[in-house]
Regions:
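Secondary-structure boundary elements
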Residues: 242-301
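N-terminal accessory/pre-domain segments preceding catalytic cores
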Residues: 36-267, 389-417
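Hydrophobic (often cysteine-bearing) scaffold residues that line and stabilize catalytic clefts
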Residues: 183, 272, 308, 312, ...
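Hydrophobic/aromatic-rich core segments of domains that either
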Residues: 311-388
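Short, positively charged and aromatic/hydrophobic N-terminal segments
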Residues: 6, 10-14, 19, 26
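Juxtamembrane low-complexity tails/linkers enriched in Ser/Thr-Pro and polybasic
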Residues: 24-36
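Catalytic cysteine-centered active-site loop
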Residues: 287-295, 299, 306, 327-338
Length: 417
């Protein structure tokens, strides 16, 4: 009996110890679960805080983009060209002939807060504008963009006030060191090239054209908007014109003259070139006073029939271009029969795949008294080769000091026929 009781107590004690161990194990499990829950709650809290911070920053960014912020400013810098063309036929009238030059002129530097400018900059693409002209083809890609912008806006520029938009196409240039100076050079080249390639744009004064660089700064990020206008001037017309109607009326007069001459066009380029040459020297008087302002363009040459060498050369190109005969204007220096050197302008024209020089100005000398000019003088510089022209004509590779360097067509060595 005692032996059975002893076995019972041993069994009971084992059961009791087992339950104690089980209870202790359960307590440890609950503690671990609580710890896991605390860690999970902490992680969730951190994640929520990060989400709130990111969301807040995003909302702040959107708000600044829409409504702007105090850290944005807009700065406009203007660059102006000067155009002071003078040419001469004799040393007594001699003045230096120049073409557009850039002068950095911060006449209107403006800084505004971002609330005045919120719209996005527009990109203007002039790639579709097709140009194939002699001096244009020598420009770099950036100058060609500005040239094409002029060509695209040619009709609008007859108003004298149209703004030529270039958008942000020069941002990569302006972000580089000295970028504004580079853009000035591109602009310089484009303006002078456009005026020499297109004598029909006689009503535009380069000295009244302003290149504007608008810089917008947002939190260290700069964007650039470039455009061309008349600055603070009422228009960019030459002094002869003040209204669009005056310009269009003059264009109409010029087109009538050109139409009459073109109606006499033959199938022989030689006779067509000779016809234009003869028309100019028969109808234009060389202006020895240099008092008129339009003596340097086709308006003075063909409408008022009085000009200097630059007017002769531009008028010749204007008429020959209509006949689709390749022609360029040339500037340089020439030495007259008295041995005096002067600034001068003339033309090169292509016939039968060769280039020849024509100097209408010196084929139309000023006659004192009732004397007459014989053919030996009248055609002295008509379709001449380099062997003749090099004796008294020297070309200039630059239209302006420090401007683009150009190459002229290579003249045939001998005269035509």
């Amino acid at each position: 009996m005692q032996k059975k009781l002893y076995h019972f107590l041993i069994i009971y004690d084992k059961i009791k110890k087992g339950k104690t161990k089980e209870k202790s194990s359960n307590n440890q499990g609950r503690k671990k679960e609580k710890m896991k829950n605390k860690v999970a709650s902490f992680i969730i809290t951190i994640v929520m805080l990060l989400i709130i911070i990111v969301l807040g920053l995003f909302i702040l960014f959107v708000w600044q983009e829409i409504f702007g912020g105090d850290d944005e400013n807009i700065q406009v810098e203007n660059y102006v060209t000067t155009y002071n063309p003078t040419s001469e036929k004799s040393v007594e009238d001699s003045e230096k002939m120049t073409t557009p030059q850039i002068i950095k002129d911060k006449i209107n530097q403006i800084i505004n807060n971002s609330q005045t400018k919120t719209e996005e900059k527009e990109t203007y693409n002039y790639a579709e504008v097709q140009v194939d002209k002699y001096f244009y083809n020598q420009l770099n890609d950036y100058s060609k963009i500005i040239y094409k912008a002029f060509e695209k806006n040619k009709e609008e520029m007859k108003t004298g006030t149209a703004q030529i938009e270039l958008g942000d196409v020069f941002t990569d240039v302006l972000k580089t060191e000295g970028g504004d100076q580079k853009l000035e050079e591109y602009y310089q080249s484009a303006v002078e090239t456009y005026l020499y390639d297109n004598p029909d744009v006689f009503y535009i004064s380069a000295s009244k054209l302003y290149l504007n660089i608008e810089t917008t700064t947002k939190r260290k990020n700069k964007t650039y908007d470039v455009f061309i206008n008349s600055g603070e001037k009422p228009n960019y017309f030459t002094d002869e014109f003040t209204t669009e109607s005056q310009v269009k009326q003059t264009i109409s007069q010029l087109e009538k003259i050109r139409s009459v001459i073109n109606s006499q066009k033959s199938n022989n380029p030689y006779y067509d070139i000779k016809m234009v040459h003869d028309y100019l020297i028969d109808n234009i008087d060389y202006d020895t006073t240099l008092a008129k302002k339009n003596i340097y363009d086709i308006y003075g040459a063909l409408v008022q029939k009085s000009c200097v060498c630059e007017g002769y050369a531009k008028a010749f190109k204007y008429l020959i271009d209509q006949m689709e005969i390749p022609c360029v204007m040339v500037i340089g220096q020439a030495t007259n029969t008295n041995g005096q050197t002067e600034n001068h302008a003339w033309n090169y024209v292509q016939i039968e795949n060769n280039w020849y020089a024509i100097d209408c100005t010196w084929d139309d000398p000023v006659v004192i008294g009732n004397g007459k000019v014989g053919n030996d003088v009248r055609y002295r510089y008509f379709l001449r080769g380099s062997s003749t022209m090099s004796k008294d004509h020297v070309t200039s590779a630059q239209f302006t000091d420090g401007g683009e360097t150009y190459e002229y067509p290579t003249l045939n060595v001998s005269d035509y026929r």
